C-alpha cells in the first residue's frame, strides 16, 4: 500500500492534506510531536445509555477513498475522567467510529472503540494501564477492523461496519482528542500514517 501521509509532526507546519475540524485554541508542533489540549466539554457520543448527544471536538482529518489503513502513536497526560485521544473515521454526525484510551482516575483506563450508526453509539472496552499507545484502523470494502499495539503485537479490538459506508465514497479519517469533563488534558501525537 502506498503512503499518502507519514507524518511525525516535527516540522514547522502541518501537512497540507490534513485540516482541522473543530480546531482547538491550544495546539502546537513540538520536537515530540503534535500537542493538542482540547477544551472542556468536547466529546463525540450519540444517545445510548447516557441519553445525550454531543458532536464537537478537535479532529485533524483528511478525505480517504477506497481501502486504507490509518495508524497513530499517541501519548497522553489526562486530568479528568474520559479524557481521550486517538483515531476517528467519520461519514456524518450519525455515522462514525473512534478508538482511543479513555481515562479513569480511580482504576485502569479504558481502551476501546465507539461505533455510531443511525445516531446511536456503542462502546466496547478493555482495561488499559499506560500513558501511550499505537492504534490502527483498516477499511476494506466498507468494513473496518480496529487494532491496538499491545506487548509488541497488533491486537484486534473490533470488527465493524458503518451503515452509511458503501465502500466507494470517501470518508474522513484522522486524529482526535476530547475532554468531556474539564480542561487541562494534553495529548501528544507522535506519528500519523495513512496507507491506501
Describe these PLM feature segments.
Residues 1-196:
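Extracellular glycan-recognition regions
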Amino acid at each position: 500500500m502506498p503512503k499518502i501521509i507519514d507524518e511525525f509532526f516535527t516540522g514547522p507546519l502541518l501537512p497540507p492534506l490534513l485540516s482541522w475540524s473543530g480546531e482547538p485554541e491550544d495546539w502546537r508542533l513540538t520536537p515530540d510531536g503534535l500537542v493538542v489540549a482540547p477544551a472542556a466539554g468536547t466529546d463525540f457520543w450519540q444517545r445510548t445509555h447516557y441519553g445525550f448527544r454531543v458532536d464537537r471536538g478537535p479532529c485533524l482529518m483528511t478525505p480517504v477513498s477506497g481501502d486504507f489503513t490509518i495508524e497513530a502513536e499517541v501519548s497522553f497526560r489526562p486530568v479528568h475522567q474520559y479524557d481521550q485521544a486517538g483515531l476517528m473515521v467519520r461519514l456524518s454526525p450519525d455515522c462514525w467510529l473512534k478508538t482511543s484510551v479513555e481515562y479513569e482516575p480511580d482504576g485502569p483506563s479504558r481502551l476501546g472503540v465507539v461505533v455510531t450508526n443511525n445516531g446511536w453509539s456503542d462502546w466496547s472496552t478493555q482495561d488499559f494501564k499506560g500513558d501511550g499507545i499505537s492504534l490502527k484502523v483498516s477499511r476494506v470494502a466498507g468494513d473496518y477492523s480496529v487494532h491496538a499495539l499491545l506487548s509488541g503485537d497488533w491486537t484486534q479490538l473490533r470488527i465493524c461496519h458503518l451503515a452509511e459506508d458503501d465502500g466507494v465514497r470517501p470518508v474522513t479519517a484522522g486524529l482526535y482528542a476530547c475532554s468531556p469533563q474539564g480542561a487541562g488534558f494534553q495529548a501528544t501525537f507522535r506519528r500519523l500514517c495513512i496507507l491506501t
